Amino acid sequence: MKEPKVSVGVMFEPKIEFILNSGFICNGAEYSGLQSVKLSGGKIEWLGKVFDELIFEPADGSISSFELKDVTIGINFHWERKENQLFKGSLKFIVEGEKITAINLLGVEEYLTSVISSEMSATASLELLKAHAVISRSWLLAQIDKNIEITNSSEKYSTMTESEGELIRWYDREDHTRFDICADDHCQRYQGITRASTPIVMDAIGQTRGELLMSEGKICDARYSKSCGGVFEEFQYCWEDKKYPYLVKQRDSKSDTIIPDLTVEKNAVEWIKESPESFCNTTDNKVLSQVLNNYDQETVNFYRWSVKYSQKELSQLILKRSGTDYGDILDLVPIERGTSGRLVKLKIVGTKRTRIIGKELEIRRTLSESHLYSSAFYVEKEMGSEQAPIAFTLKGAGWGHGVGLCQIGAAVMGEKGYNYKEILLHYFIGATINKMY
């Protein structure tokens, strides 16, 4: 197996300005300097001519780089912002809908250098970085394989089922059909060479080059999130109804504590009310700074957290985020939970409409201006004099979907002296680590 290439969708705008910092070849000629493309009649206009697609290949791959202006990062998150970003590799433009998509084409190991630098802090330990290199590489190649399977299948792939009384939707990278993955948190945070990689990141990638998590002869769909909240979630409760043997419930701890059945409502509420010992139950800034970039460090309480809305605030928020008018919200009723206590289905009861929504990210998107920290929460209602709720408090656990590697837990394990293989096999139960190229 040779090192694969990857195509990354970086930005989506009707007009894109970019700088070729050295020579790039396009349509047989060499170009450099400031350029711009814009949408024109469903095609790409550049230098007064229109094209279905454009590709700029570096004249010298060792030194060539390009800069994209005003790339949006943190799309739909509370810290969404624009920044100029620098990339190596090739640059391709295509048209999708009413926008031009800028795509970066490059080798997997070069891509990983950016992902690890973007996802992790430069202060992270070598073992944590090595573990992250293996899961990021595995996740990426598993997604490419999955996309090929979906493309070759005669069955229509859908991430949503909807009826009058229920909307079940999950969010995965299958939204992307003309490139492998996107550059935002929807896939993996990728910012080219904008943030200089450190020697330790290069070392972690070099030491694990070509290593993949494998299970039953296939590359593992190696998911990760910030904090599992003490128990791992299972894949099928967050995405399609598919059970993977290596993504199963387990305590984020080496203790022998028995996990209560958190799919049972009473147990889930009691679990969230507690703050049990776990690898990811930490307030150690030295550890947290290894995982959280500056804008993530704005989040202080993540292992156990609380959010409060007045009835009016919640009603307006749900209308704005879902586009569905439930009227005044009367109740939020848990219908189904996963193995970590995360809600898979939630019933929204309003004066105009009642509906069940899921899965976990749909719930998180509907109940927050950006994303709730997780769907592992229970609801406390404050009742008014007319027996109508005047406020709702959501009390929750963890940060993210909780499937696979828990980044904060893994950082703590690294600090405690576990090596990267021990960290990986704690989170991906029964998997193996194989060098494939």
Where are these regions (language model features)?
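Conserved, single-site charged/polar hotspot
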Residues: 1-437
